[in-house]
Amino acid sequence: MPELKPWQKTWQQVRRLAGQLPKPPAPKIPAALRAPAKLKTWQLTAGAATVGLAVAAGAVAAAGPWDSSGQRTAERDWAASQEAGGGTDHGGRTSGRAPAAAPSAPSVLRGLGAPVGSAHGGSAPAPDGKALAGVLDPLLKDKALGPERSAVVIDAGTGRRVYGKGGGDALTPASTTKIATAVAALTSAGADHRITTKTVIEPDSKDVVLVGGGDPTLTARKDGPYSGSAASLRELAEDTARALKDRGTDKVNLSYDTSLYTGEQQHPIGPNENLTLVSALMADEGRLDDSSSGPAPRSGDPAGDAAKKFAELLEEQGIETGADAGAKGKKDGREPGPSKASDRAESLAKVESAPLSALVERMLTHSDNDIAEALARQTALASKEPVSFDGADKAINAQLKKAQLPLKGTKFADGSGLDRADRSSAELLSALLARAADPAHPELRSVVTGLPVAGFTGTLVDRYPKDSPGTGVVRAKTGTLTGVNTLAGTVVDTDGRLLVFAFMTTGTTDPKAAQGALDRMASAVATCGCR
């Protein structure tokens, strides 16, 4: 994503300060005048998919998802799906299972079910490298791309590279770094791992500590797109209050513990609306507005604000709170301050995040930087490295090295890709995706199902027009910084084979033109049928 100019940073500071001012109470609107509840993305997308299946069932049965011209028949449902432009929705009560595949782009997911070593969705031979080069070489020379450019295409069924130009060059990956973060986190912590936020009470005291576990999706909101699946600070307050009352306690000293994370909280790019401070405790990603994704004004103290909100929620449950008398930096007699829970502290209550696989999907679909940094630290934690930027760098590298992935020249200065010091190669990005698409690694499936679908979801919702051959076919993670554009993902070609690709370029001067050039390359891979 583009870096901020000085005036933009100043404007962000003004917005943050404004967001911290008390807000007037919202007027009550009669129920009869309220707008109907907005349908969730999966409901809209699934509805469009159902209509498309009903209309095209006969054609698909006869000829699969492609018509005689090589156009994907599901594209006729494009218009209906545009209303769902927010990306994969994880709303609803979360089960212990990994998330189901997004209902869009079934041809891509169909290829994922093939046995290892098969054609991944088709029995036709892999594309011919020379023929594919004849299509991609001219596109890679597009003047909209910067002076440094690289591209790799791999046949997922065989693992064979069918196209490569500068694939081993370590370039700035921008947000495609999140693919590496996702694979490392899922490999080290596991797809079913959940992040815990808890409350404890010190023995023989009324000292209650809110302990952050690093859950970036913890929410204090009553309603929201993730309120049904994300861990709720409100639920934690209710359960904590119940446990305290069972002990005969209705007045406590409240503090909060963020000691799980070490090192600098501030991302190297400085204060920025693209992410909050990297803290083990936050609610709603420290957002000062009602957004759930994208840039937003952020709190300068997400942990303190979350603890303050928790105190308010406890008081709503009849528990009077005060600051821990021994806490450093307490603000006044009622606001909780930071502390560290002792090993002897007794559990009161806890809430857990959705499975890591669901967090990965949300991160990739919306390019969520807060989740990315949290997953990098979960990787460090699982790898027994310091839970910091440096520790996460070592942990991600170590996990990918275990998987024997190509790491020459790589650096993970952060987990999100916002740091321009990050380095990756098209060879690594494509290898990560090929591994995630391999049925031998079901723990990585959410890396593929979380990729935005061209013209349908997440950061690709506006990138592909409805008449583009890549619409609904290309699934890819985008990456954008000033002068940097990347695209890495999967397609199922006209012969039904699953291919993975990674395209990188630096030194671009027109981001829209560069994005268009990369999108055309991905579409060309999907429609080539090169022999």
What is the predicted function of each stretch?
Residues 159, 173-191, 281, 309-310, ...:
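Active-site SXXK
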Residues 381-531:
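Small-residue-rich helix-loop
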Residues 197-203, 208-268, 276-306, 354-393:
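Active-site-adjacent helix/loop patches that line small-molecule binding or acyl-intermediate pockets
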Residues 277, 283-445:
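A small/polar active-site loop signature that marks catalytic segments
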Residues 188-203, 323-325, 444-447:
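Short, well-structured active-site flanking segments
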Residues 29-98, 527, 531:
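Hydrophobic single-pass membrane-targeting/anchoring helices
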Residues 85-169, 239-248:
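Beta-lactamase-like hydrolase cores
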